[in-house]
Regions:
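Extracellular/periplasmic, surface-exposed regions of secreted and cell-surface proteins
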Residues: 1-244
Length: 244
């Protein structure tokens, strides 16, 4: 079990016409037009229940599995929890008996894995600067006071149904070390699909919402490919080695 909590409290003020520029106190100034004080608090919390299983048989066969259930305060309580995990396995082929006479293979491993991962981060633009949106599912307002009257101005349109962005990843490949470790590397195929992308969707002014966008889960992304990583020793001497 794990829990993370973030709380950031900010209080600041400003004034003009400093009497002494080396004294940073509001009472050291006589300004009226720019006299101002503001404060805000950011709250964020995640909670997770996790487990992991690892198995090794005879130094040749390896299995692993993990599962976690996470909650994020960025989402409404009805959509706060997500289920994630992974499974993987590896076979150290060079430890098999049929490889005993294959001297030019120092290590040969076949590996594969599948996993699910979640993302809850969504940014918001405040005064031209992007920062974390800690309350993405809630409508957010600015308080305005003029002529003795209070008013609320909508600055961010929340989405109650917002939930985790989820990525599914599959990898299969091989690691190898050959020719007395002169050549080693990895060949791996990967496939990654992300669903329920977290995105600030633009909305028309005619909707009556002046913020210009609202958070939503929209669209999928698919990435596939092959990765090749090779390292070789070109020259090897008693006191030196040249690799690339």
């Amino acid at each position: 079990y794990e829990q993370y909590r973030y709380k950031n409290q900010v209080l600041y003020g400003e004034n003009t016409n400093l009497y002494n520029p080396y004294i940073g106190e509001l009472n050291n100034a006589g300004g009226i037009d720019k006299k101002n004080a503001k404060s805000y608090t950011d709250n964020y919390m995640t909670e997770g229940i996790l487990s992991r299983l690892q198995y090794n048989y005879d130094g040749k066969y390896f299995l692993s599995a993990s599962y976690r259930r996470d909650a994020s305060s960025r989402f409404h309580k009805d959509h706060r929890w997500g289920n994630f995990g992974s499974v993987g396995g590896a076979w150290l082929i060079n430890h098999e008996k049929f490889m005993e006479n294959v001297k030019w293979v120092n290590m040969l491993k076949l590996k594969a894995s599948w996993g699910v991962q979640g993302n809850d981060r969504l940014l918001i633009t405040v005064n031209g600067v992007q920062r974390d949106n800690w309350y993405a599912y809630q409508d957010q307002y600015d308080v305005n006071y003029a002529n003795g009257q209070y008013s609320l101005i909508l600055k961010y349109k929340g989405t109650k149904d917002l939930t985790w962005e989820t990525s599914y990843a599959f990898n299969i490949g091989t690691d190898f070390e050959l020719f007395n470790n002169r050549l080693n590397g990895t060949i791996e195929y990967f496939s990654r699909k992300t669903v329920d992308l977290l995105y600030n969707k633009p909305i028309p002014v005619s909707s009556g919402i002046s913020t210009g966008y609202e958070p939503t889960n929209v669209g999928d992304i698919m990435n596939k490919g092959v990765e090749l990583d090779l390292n070789g020793i070109i020259l090897r001497g008693k006191d030196y080695e040249w690799a690339m």
